[in-house]
């Protein structure tokens, strides 16, 4: 296609889509309804609230925000818990948040140490060091680690201040700047009483209750496009066919089982349930789907098309592999092949592909830069793309984690995001837009005969399958699924019990568990997620009315690595290390 020109002979602006993905796995035990880890509510009060606040204050900015449905349900549940606690004194089912609301700290040494350890889980440079009182408290916790007998001599005030400061540090920068109650607490600094902690809990409850409606209002105003991922964030191509892992890595070792039993039925369940949860919270059906971890295959796109999904997206290397296989990969530095949408033959779903260099620059490179310098370089890259010529179908897709990057930035990315939205929305050669609008503007994208299956991470599925520990995770899941299928065939499950079991199975099918397995990741994170995975599988057996296999009481993977961003994020391409 020839370079497009707007009215008056000026070059057409470069379409740029920023897509922020928000996701946490299910941390809640569906039986006890207690939360094993606090990351859902902590990211809500820090990152989800900041991201929506930045968009509200930048009326010219337009972006895509993608939510995993299992995350939406957890945010809603937390909001209800806090409201019920404040209104009726009901218990909070997250130990860390409950400690903030409690009149007194735990009495036992083990419980006190557990609480103190939990309050260390924050970025040292940006969430601890800026606050002298919090920093001093964490130094005392490090001493108590070595001298646990000292826990019995710590005052109630020590634990009250520690848990209060932990939550103050995890608040979004926009909240700290704009909420007078929070400013007063931070000014006080120490000696927090129950009234102070209840005030902070009230702030947290307000954030949890309002954050999703704020995104909805922006979507209804046409300023944001909201999209979804399959319900519990499974790797869809692998559920459909485990051998999809070998399309990009032909020698990848696979689990002993030939296939995941009933995989297509399970994918349809995740899509149907995910769309229903999305519509419940946002009042409309989603037009687009960021598939879990950008995992796409030809069969996946066809299922999305059957479900009426207008667009989806994946990683740069997935497209490169697919074009290379078809003999259609254009050589050269301008990479026009990347900055355009495609459509797999015999589908109605448009596919967009992530610019790894631009996306990973935000995720990994710019955190230590001055905000103006970082945004200046980012915009310069876009200007370079525009200078090479904007075709009628040119779209630059910048897709990344919308929650984990910001703790590595000063002020939770406050200055960077403000500058980014201001520069992009005012730039004469750049048009901030959404994938849905691009689908409308480009009704006939380029055609692909098939996709080489892969994810946004290196264009492969090696993050989730293909080594001993990850394959062991799949084998445990497949065995549980086989037991569930037999229980259904035998008529031992039906009605509400069957629905609970299918929901629990969905949780076990999520991508996060295998993401963490293996020695690449930090030991503490691997231990947390491996233990929770085995627990979720054990609950599934209990819901089936079957004894929990003894193997689920044994640890099968250990971490020990020191990856970038603590393992919470990966680069899209090994070329951008």
Task: Describe the function of each predicted region.
Residues 2, 47-54, 208-217, 273-276, ...:
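Short alpha-helical segments and helix-capping/turn motifs at coil-helix boundaries
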Residues 9-184, 328-577:
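Active-site and substrate-binding clefts of carbohydrate-active enzymes
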Residues 66-71, 230-233, 288-296, 436-439:
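Short, solvent-exposed turn/loop segments enriched in Gly/Ser/Thr/Pro and often Arg
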Residues 149, 167-170, 202-233, 242-243:
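Structured, charged N-terminal subsegments at the starts of enzyme catalytic cores
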Residues 185-208, 212, 305, 317-319, ...:
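Extended, Lys/Arg-enriched charged tracts that mediate electrostatic binding to polyanionic substrates
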Residues 236-237, 247-265, 269-271, 317-321, ...:
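Positively charged, amphipathic and often flexible ligand-engagement surfaces
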Residues 250-291, 380-399:
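CE4/NodB-like, metal-dependent polysaccharide N-deacetylase domain
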């Amino acid at each position: 296609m020839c370079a497009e020109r707007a009215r008056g002979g000026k070059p057409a602006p470069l379409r740029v889509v920023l897509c922020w993905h928000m996701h946490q796995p299910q941390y809640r035990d569906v039986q006890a309804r207690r939360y094993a880890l606090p990351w859902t509510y902590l990211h809500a009060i820090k990152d989800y609230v900041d991201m929506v606040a930045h968009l509200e204050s930048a009326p010219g900015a337009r972006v895509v925000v993608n939510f995993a449905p299992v995350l939406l349900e957890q945010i809603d549940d937390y909001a209800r818990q806090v409201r019920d606690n404040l209104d009726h004194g009901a218990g909070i089912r997250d130990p860390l948040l409950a400690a903030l609301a409690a009149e007194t700290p735990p009495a036992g040494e083990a419980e006190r140490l557990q609480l103190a350890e939990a309050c260390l889980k924050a970025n040292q440079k940006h969430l601890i060091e800026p606050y002298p009182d919090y920093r001093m408290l964490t130094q005392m916790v490090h001493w108590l680690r070595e001298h646990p007998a000292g826990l019995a001599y710590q005052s109630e005030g020590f634990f009250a201040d520690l848990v209060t400061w932990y939550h103050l540090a995890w608040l979004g920068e926009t909240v700290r700047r704009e909420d007078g109650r929070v400013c007063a607490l931070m000014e006080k600094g120490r000696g927090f009483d129950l009234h102070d902690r209840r005030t902070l809990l009230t702030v947290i409850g307000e954030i949890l209750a309002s954050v999703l409606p704020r995104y909805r209002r922006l979507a209804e105003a046409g300023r944001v496009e909201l999209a979804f991922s399959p319900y519990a964030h499974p790797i869809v191509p692998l559920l459909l066919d485990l051998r999809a892992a070998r399309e990009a890595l032909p020698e990848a070792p696979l689990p002993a089982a030939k296939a995941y039993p009933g995989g297509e039925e399970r994918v349809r369940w995740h899509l149907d349930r995910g769309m229903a949860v999305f519509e419940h919270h946002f009042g409309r059906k989603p037009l687009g789907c960021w598939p879990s971890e950008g995992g796409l295959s030809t069969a996946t796109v066809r299922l999305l098309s059957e479900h009426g999904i207008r667009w989806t997206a994946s990683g740069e290397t997935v497209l490169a592999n697919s074009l290379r296989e078809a003999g259609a990969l254009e050589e050269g530095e301008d990479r026009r092949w990347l900055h355009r949408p495609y459509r797999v033959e015999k589908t109605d779903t448009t596919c967009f592909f992530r610019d790894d260099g631009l996306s990973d620059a935000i995720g990994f490179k710019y955190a230590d830069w001055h905000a103006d310098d970082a945004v200046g370089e980012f915009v310069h890259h876009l200007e370079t793309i525009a200078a090479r010529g904007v075709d009628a179908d040119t779209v630059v897709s910048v897709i990344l984690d919308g929650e984990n990057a910001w703790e590595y930035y000063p002020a939770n990315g406050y200055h960077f995001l403000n500058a980014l939205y201001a520069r992009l929305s005012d730039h004469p050669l750049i048009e901030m837009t959404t994938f849905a609008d691009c689908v409308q503007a480009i009704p006939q994208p380029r055609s692909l005969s098939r996709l080489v299956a892969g994810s946004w991470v290196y264009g492969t599925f090696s993050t989730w399958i293909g080594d001993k520990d990850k394959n062991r995770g799949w084998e445990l899941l497949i065995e549980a699924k086989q037991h569930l299928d037999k229980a259904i065939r035998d008529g031992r499950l039906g009605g509400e019990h069957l629905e609970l079991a299918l929901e629990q199975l969905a949780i076990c099918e999520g991508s996060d568990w295998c993401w963490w397995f293996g020695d690449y990741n930090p030991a503490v994170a691997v231990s947390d997620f491996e233990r929770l995975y085995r627990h979720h599988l054990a609950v599934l057996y209990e819901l089936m009315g079957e004894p929990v296999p003894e193997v689920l009481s044994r640890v099968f993977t250990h971490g020990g690595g020191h990856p970038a961003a603590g393992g919470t994020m990966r680069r899209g391409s090994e070329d951008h290390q």
